[in-house]
Every structure is written in C-alpha cells, then in structure tokens.
C-alpha cells in the first residue's frame, strides 16, 4: 500500500508541474487503488487530452464519477456536476452505467480505501485524506517511530527500555 502512496505523491507532483505524460502512469496506479485525487486527475487528463493521452469521454466521466463520492473535495464534486450538466438527456443512462461500472471496480468497496476531509485543529482549510482500511494492520509501533516529526522513542516510555 505504501508504494501506492508514493505513486500518488509523485504523480501529483508531476501533475502540478504540468508534466502530464510523466504523471499519468503514477496517477493511474493510485487511481486504480482508490485514491480520489488521483482518480480525478486521471479523469481530467482524459477529459482534456493532456500529455499525449487521447481524449476519452467515457474514461473521463468514469474516473471523475468514482472520485466524486460524498466525501470527496468540493472541487471534484463540482467538476463532476459540471460534466453531468452537459450530458444530453438521451445519454444519461449510458453515463450512469459507466460511472456505476467504475465505482464497482475502483470505489471504496472494491479497493478498501476510505477518504475523509480532515482539518488541522484551529484551521478552516480541509484536505482530502485517503487511507486503506487494512493499511496499518501489519505494522507495529517500531514502524511508526517518527509520527508528526516526533520520535516515539522520545515520547513513549514503553520503548525506552530499563
């Protein structure tokens, strides 16, 4: 799971630098594993045809649709709503089917990734944080010896020894 976090971060960095062709494979890997921002970015790349990736309306609406869950950031939800407003009524059922297929393959139930908007205490700025439900099951306290920049060896008397 941690390699996917690396792909999500690297893809995001390249995306922000507008290096879409380089970002795409990293974002796609993270998107397939359930990371909402990566899903939205893959959808946007398909929607706009960026970085040499051919425009693909079905893939664009599918990826942005799965990213636009209730707990997604407002920007993702609003972008999806804007896309849906441009869909002719005769194609709504087709679009619903595409989004349903993507949600069944890459949504929370399929990937085990849960996302929430979180805020730092005292701040009005929220960020979308996604975690795999089993991400920490196989880790122990020694794997998390630096949490929030503080060594657990400095703060946890159980780890100091006699």
Tell me the role of every PLM-derived stretch.
Residues 141-161:
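Short, low-complexity, Pro/Ser/Thr/Gly-rich segments in the mature regions of secreted, periplasmic
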Residues 54-75, 81-82, 88, 93-106:
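TPR/TPR-like (Sel1-like) alpha-helical repeat modules
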Residues 2-3, 7, 14, 18, ...:
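Short helix-capping/linker turns of helical repeat alpha-solenoids
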Residues 22-26:
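Repeat-mediated protein-protein interaction surfaces in helical alpha-solenoids
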Residues 35, 41-51, 64-65:
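Consensus positions within tandem repeat domains that build extended binding/scaffold surfaces
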Residues 89-137, 141:
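Pro/Ala/Gly-rich low-complexity, hydrophilic intrinsically disordered segments
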Residues 5-16, 41-48, 78-84:
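Hydrophobic face of amphipathic alpha-helices that form TPR/SEL1-like repeat modules
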Residues 29-30, 67:
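Canonical positions in the second alpha-helix
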